[in-house]
A protein has these predicted regions:
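Short, structural beta-strand-to-alpha-helix junction motif
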Residues: 20-21, 25
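Surface-exposed cap/linker segments adjacent to membranes
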Residues: 1-19, 34
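Concave beta-strand-loop units of leucine-rich repeat
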Residues: 28-107, 113-129, 135-151, 157-174, ...
Length: 281
């Protein structure tokens, strides 16, 4: 893949000479970040940063270009990761514009030892390649359009799942097949058809925080499953305009371990008398 090759060449400061497997096999983490900065009268600059961890050493290189065009080819494939024999974590992010060419996660299935996988700003057609990552503990897919989580069923080691800022999740039913899952984020405007499957989970952390003006996404949603999460420790309901004091009391009654409840900009936060003193302990 031209995008992956360019990123690795930048990281290794190897613009032309041959790159062999031995050059990358010892890398434990690889992070590729592309961001466009709007600087007013100074114009627009696009910056790509590539970072890697190799044992206790950190490698980092950066390249920039004037304008919205990336100084490196866009990432379109993960097949080259098969050469990173020691890789435990991979992260790719592009903002504020999504990489429309990054639609295929094929190639990642060879990385059965991967523990952390994070992608922001792609448009994956399917998550099936991720189903082979049996050691995956943390998964983040943000600004990735519409996602069908079905292929994630059976990832027995997955503890944290971040699905913020997506257009839509087809169904939350697959999260009930993730026995180790303790943290789930659906914040910043990710639409879901129902919260009912969450009642079958053992979540400790649930982030449903919305941005200003996004409350309409939950206009028809039944909130009652949130009062059926006995293991809950942290819950974010920011900007949910249908969350009342009465409902918050139901949550507190059924979640004895709850220590943090964010109800900013909800009816429950407007002069209500929630009995939440013990949450501050």
């Amino acid at each position: 893949d031209a995008g992956m090759e360019a990123a690795v060449r930048l990281l290794l400061n190897r613009p032309e000479s041959t790159i062999s497997r031995s050059d990358v096999w010892g890398l434990n983490t690889l992070t590729i970040t592309e961001r466009t900065m709007f600087e007013g009268d100074s114009g627009t600059t696009t910056i790509v940063t590539v970072t890697a961890q190799q044992g206790d050493a950190t490698l980092e290189q950066e390249i920039s270009a004037v304008g919205k065009e990336s100084p490196l080819p866009a990432l379109a494939s993960l097949h080259d990761l098969q050469y990173f024999d020691s890789l435990q974590a991979f992260s790719y992010s592009t903002s504020p514009t999504a990489n429309q060419a990054f639609t295929d996660f094929s190639g990642i299935e060879t990385m059965s030892h991967l523990e952390r996988f994070s992608v922001n700003g792609a448009r994956p057609e399917t998550l099936e390649p991720l189903s082979h990552l049996s050691q995956l503990k943390q998964l983040s897919l943000t600004e990735c359009g519409t996602l069908d989580l079905t292929p994630l069923e059976g990832l027995d080691q997955l503890e944290s799942l971040i699905l913020s800022s997506n257009d839509r999740i087809v169904s939350l039913e697959p999260v009930t097949k993730l026995p180790a899952l303790r943290s789930l984020s659906l914040s910043s405007g990710t639409a879901v058809p129902s919260l009912e499957p969450l009642a079958q989970t053992h979540l400790a952390v649930l982030d449903l925080g919305l941005g200003v003006g996004q409350s309409g996404l939950y206009k028809e949603i039944d909130y009652s499953p949130l009062s059926q999460l006995p293991d809950l420790v942290c819950l974010n309901l920011t900007n949910h305009t249908r969350v009342t004091t009465k409902f918050c009391k139901q949550i507190l009654a059924h979640s004895p371990d709850l220590r943090f409840l964010n109800i900013q900009n909800t009816p429950a936060s407007e002069g209500s008398a929630l009995d939440v003193e013990y949450l501050r302990a």
